[in-house]
Amino acid sequence: MATLAFFTSSLHHKTLTPKPTSQTLIHLPKSPNFKSLTSIIKPKPLISPPIRSTTTTTTISDTTTTPQTLKTRLKNGETLYGLFLLSFSPTLAEIAALSGYDFVVVDMEHGPGGIVEALACLHALAAARTPAIIRLPESDPAWAKKALDLGPQGIMFPMIENQKMAKKAVSYCKFPPNGVRGSAHTVVRASDYGIDNGYLSNYEDELLIMCQVESEEGVKKIEEIAMVDGVDCVQMGPLDLSASMGYLWDPGHKKVKEVLRTAEKGVLKTTEKGRGGGGAFLSGFAMPHDRPEEMRLRGYHMISGAVDIGLFRSACVEDVKRFKSLLASDEDDDEVDNGKDGDEKYWSE
């Protein structure tokens, strides 16, 4: 993972004296999916230390602290909360990262962007020290190779329906002889453009491989998928699952929920078998009928609670609705209220 790419441009051949990294307690605003305030500990962005004339030498890695990977945090029992980025806007990616999400999924399956646009989003996320996951347009070795060369911390393969497809997905992530991934590790962002000499020995331990199950056929094979060596997470896809069952855009249908619960239990059964003997973590999307706190109680380890476009759409619709309602009320009342309530939630609030 290219965690240091953001900092290398300001480092020179001269010696450096590193500054310790400090942390800030951030109180997050109330989420549309969570009822209570949440707090996180987030490292302050590191500023390149000044150049000093000294005989002490340091390496680039000495000037930063390396946060735990998503994979490590899952193994430590954390529940991670993230966002899907469909706009491919680096600005929205950075805002999401600074807001405190544990991860951001850059969605190449349903978003309009390609590799170049995804790279810009990964730069923005790296600047805010937030892990990126890339969801591929399809489970394909060429797409996987190009995405992995960008250096995301995780990769998600859509529409995995059986053990064979899951094994192929894992093979796309590993170099020969363990897989079929093409090698250009000396010049790609994933290895800090060849500067990270430990990339080849570490990347398999750090990369989070996610297989998305989103069909009735996939649910039937979900335990086999979860037990494939190298599959770290099984991501549930309730919308496509409902469509495959004949209930398009109705993931809250009773029959869809029953199948989804069966799938969840199948994945969790493999998780309980322990990391040494295989098994995967359970991840999924929150829905209006299935809120994040309910998913956490059912055993989900990774939860995506929102989509950037959806959040922006809802904010816009609510903003226009509020203004239109004020116009309607003004028809019966000529007095204009210039108080605080009229300016609430505009600009900075």
Give, region by region, the residue ranges found by the protein language model.
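Expand to "…catalyze enediolate/carbanion chemistry for C-C bond making/breaking, isomerization
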Residues: 2-349
